[in-house]
Amino acid sequence: MRHWLFKSEPDCYSFTDLENAPGQTTSWDGVRNYQARNFMRDDMKKGDLGFFYHSGKNPEIAGIVEIVREGHPDITAQDPEAGHFDPKATPGDPRWYMVDVRLVRSFVPPVPRAFLRRQP
């Protein structure tokens, strides 16, 4: 089993959004970084765990998620109405991938990055 970091701006998609999602599960879509895409497409496996990390003004780990569906084409790349549209993505050559994650555990309170930096 491998472990991953799932980073999100809390004003775009927060841990609370995941808590309120049906089945506390969501597709981790919209990633437009080639190395992260390759990890999702090739390396992330069902059952792997990850930290849900809020970036931004108050960076913190809000909880733990589990990958429940391995890499599959990111449909937002092919939707002109989506904020992550890529005109070069096609059904035959999707270019971008996503995984589905489910909430495992929330950290109350969340673990601030400043605390993590003080750990050996």
Describe the residue ranges of each PLM region:
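Short, charged beta-turn/beta-strand-edge "cap" motif at the junction between a beta-strand
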Residues: 53-59
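Short acidic/glycine-rich loop or secondary-structure boundary segments that cap or lie
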Residues: 14-16, 59-63, 74-76
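A broadly conserved detector of short glycine/acidic/proline-rich loop/turn motifs that flank catalytic sites
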Residues: 10, 56, 105-107
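Residues that flank catalytic or metal-binding motifs in active/ligand-binding sites
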Residues: 2, 61, 97
